[in-house]
Amino acid sequence: SRFDRGMLLEMDFDAYHPRIIADIIGYELPSNSIHEYFGKQYFGKETISEEEYEASKKITFRLLYGGIDKDFEKVPFFGKTKKYIYNLWNTFKKRGYVVTPFMKRPLYKNCLHDMNPNKLFNYLLQASETEYNLSMINNVNDLLCEYNSELVLYTYDSLLFDFDLKDGKDLILKLQSVMNQAGRFPVKTKAGANYHVMTDMTSRIS
């Protein structure tokens, strides 16, 4: 940290892409672990083991990026997602373009090559992620204008701050509020003297 009394503060989104998809298709996900939420549906259990939790993560990302198998359409989130992909593809073929859900930017057929339904959906998802982040970072920077702390690094699902301890817990709570957007995108918080010694502080800051 550049501050005498400072630390690095990292805030990252929990399962960012699935939550963006939920926002796009109008599906309400729980604020706690979605891998546990989906795992219970995949395995038909009220409680899942650690092995099933890890398997749930792999299944979810395979379905989102590799296509949704017919067997998993019965899981409501994925059934609704598959229907959205089908309608998106039909619109793309009919009109020659689709628009991003958030900023309404067109994605034109003549600029995208070798497309298929799932590839188009992944293009749209990545574009939506960028648009969500641009809006969120603008709001974060507006908030930071009144403080010493600074945003120093952005990756697709996390922000890293050089945090001045003088700014206090109040700023951390405000940053969490800006990023989670009324609970739509839950945020995990870590802090440490450097990037290699970050400690999870999510449960301590609320």
List each language-model region with its residue ranges:
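Conserved catalytic core of nucleotide polymerization and phosphodiester-bond processing enzymes
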Residues: 1-206
